[in-house]
């Protein structure tokens, strides 16, 4: 049972099914899902971790200004090889490009998170965090790349892949938060909510 010290609703500023599933793991079912629909383009010379946090902040701010009461959770995930930011894929060509960039290399996954507490149409508190995980992918064969592209699992994903599917069998090692790689670091998210007055673990019983 979710325990909130002020019983305000949770609003997820994302239509990501992965983030919704992750929140359910910590007993949170958002009252509303409101995608922010912002321009997610990077700025010139912007670092990957800065992009992830900037976009999360913009998403949270856009939704929070239209909320009467609640906690707005916004996140953005960026995949980078060195300082090269990989795209959020739209086409099979995008996925193939990302896989070739990731093949045989380490890459970093950054998720920026902002949680904003709104009461009586006023922002009364917020918390931000950026979490980094490191992943090493095996050297992929042309057949492995073609097979993964054909699954369509990499479409509409940061870096052209989803760790929840076939991609996991290509990973040699990971360091850091697994849920961060999926799109929402649960340890940090729970602590951020708690600092704002919401405990998703404590039971009323």
Curated annotation (Swiss-Prot):
It is found in: Cytoplasm. Keywords: Cytoplasm, Hydrolase, Nucleotide metabolism. It comes from the Bacteria. Its cofactor is a divalent metal cation. Disulfide bonds: none annotated. It is an enzyme of class 3 (hydrolase). Its EC number is 3.6.1.9. One of its GO terms (biological process) is nucleotide metabolic process. It catalyses: a ribonucleoside 5'-triphosphate + H2O = a ribonucleoside 5'-phosphate + diphosphate + H(+); a 2'-deoxyribonucleoside 5'-triphosphate + H2O = a 2'-deoxyribonucleoside 5'-phosphate + diphosphate + H(+). Pfam families: Maf (PF02545). One of its GO terms (cellular component) is cytoplasm. GO terms for molecular function: nucleoside triphosphate diphosphatase activity. The active site is at residue 76. HAMAP family: Maf. Belongs to the Maf family. Nucleoside triphosphate pyrophosphatase. May have a dual role in cell division arrest and in preventing the incorporation of modified nucleotides into cellular nucleic acids. NCBIfam families: maf. This is Nucleoside triphosphate pyrophosphatase. It comes from Orientia tsutsugamushi (strain Boryong).
């Amino acid at each position: 049972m979710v325990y909130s010290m002020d019983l305000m609703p949770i609003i997820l500023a994302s239509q990501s099914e992965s983030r919704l599933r992750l929140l359910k793991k910590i007993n949170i079912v958002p009252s509303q899902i409101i995608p922010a629909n912002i321009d997610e383009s990077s700025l010139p010379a912007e670092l990957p971790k800065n992009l992830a946090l900037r976009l999360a902040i913009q998403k949270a701010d856009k939704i929070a200004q239209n909320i009467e009461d609640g906690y707005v959770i916004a996140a953005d995930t960026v995949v980078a090889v060195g300082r090269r930011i990989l795209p959020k894929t739209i086409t099979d060509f995008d996925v193939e490009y990302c896989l070739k960039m990731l093949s045989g290399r380490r890459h970093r996954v950054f998720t920026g998170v902002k949680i904003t507490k709104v009461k009586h149409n006023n922002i009364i508190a917020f918390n931000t965090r950026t979490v980094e995980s490191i992943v090493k992918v095996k050297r992929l064969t042309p057949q492995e790349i073609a097979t993964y592209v054909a699954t369509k699992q990499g479409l509409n994903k940061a870096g052209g892949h989803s760790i929840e599917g076939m991609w996991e069998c290509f990973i040699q090692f990971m360091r850091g938060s697994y849920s961060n790689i999926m799109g929402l670091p649960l340890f940090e998210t729970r602590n951020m909510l708690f600092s704002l007055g919401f405990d998703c673990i404590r039971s009323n019983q």
